[in-house]
Amino acid sequence: MPLDKRQRDLPLGLSPQACFKDIVGRSVLPRIPLPELGKLYAAKLQARCLQPPPFQSLLCSHDKESYGKRFSRSDMRSWCAAATTTTTPLGALESSQKRLLIFDQSGDQTRLLQCPFPLRFPSHAAAEPVKLSELQGIEKAFKEDGEEFHKSDGTESEMHEDTEEINALLYSDDDYDDDCESDDEVMSTGHSPYPNEGVCNKRELEEIDGPCKRQKLLDKVNNISDLSSLVGTESSTQLNGSSFLKDKKLPESKTISTKEDTGSGLSNEQSKKDKIRTALKILESVVPGAKGNEALLLLDEAIDYLKLLKRDLISTEVKNQSSTTHKSPILLLKETTWGTRNLQTDKA
């Protein structure tokens, strides 16, 4: 016959056959009735309050007259009632160590089974603060873990953004790389795999040297732009010096030179604007009737004035050439006769 169904509620799912020992079966002493056993157990609990007495001592202190008697269900019930009605201090029973007892009635015999290790059953009042403290500690641990997780998420997102920007800068020429890959695949078909390894090594080296090369290219571009700006300023100053600064009467040429000497801290845009203004003023002084006009009208008038000067020069050159080559013989004779007359008057 199996044991009672309440054996399923044993702590940690232990089997009664593994964790209980048969006290009555091992003992040589005779059995005692259940009511007397319960009374003895209650008296011992009242005396000690913390630890229950070992059942071996209880079994040794029984009467020999009860040997040979069998326990019935009524005796067991009366023993349980006596054990529950005994007055014991509540705090001591709640916090005391308890051992588990099982009465096995299999067949015609009854056996008393005892757990070899004590079982602690803490009181409800003593268990609550422990649970609350444990819960508070668990909550704090969860909060700290959540904060660390959020911080790690922020750092990971920032690192992810930084890596995306770096990848966008480094691998902006993916199309060119794809073309190279297709060409390499076409070349490597039907050959040994060593060209592919060479391509991979080259690509790794390019990935490593990519930022350095790009930085060098940017530095070169900046240097070229600086040199071009310097060349442009020098050429503009040379043109101004060759065309306008030769005229010593213009006082504005002196101001331009002083500005170029002392205005090193000005920006390129401001210097360009100043140069344009000075050139417009010079054109106003050179072109007749161009004062007070706008910049576009002044430029148109200056262009027309230059065209007129060019035509006048061409016409004067043509007249001079025609006058020297087409002299009449009458004028030559007159000059000769006039010269002879002057000679005769001088002799007289």
Swiss-Prot record:
* Cellular localisation: Nucleus
Superkingdom field: Eukaryota
On tissue specificity, the annotation reads: Expressed in seedlings, roots, stems, leaves, and flowers.
Q: Write one Pfam family the protein is assigned to.
A: bHLH_SAC51
The record, for InterPro entries, names: bHLH_dom, HLH_DNA-bd_sf, SAC51-like
UniProt record similarity statement: Belongs to the bHLH protein family.
What does the record give as the function of this protein?
Transcription factor. Involved in stem elongation, probably by regulating a subset of genes involved in this process.
Stated name of the protein: Transcription factor SAC51
The organism encoding this protein is Arabidopsis thaliana (Mouse-ear cress)
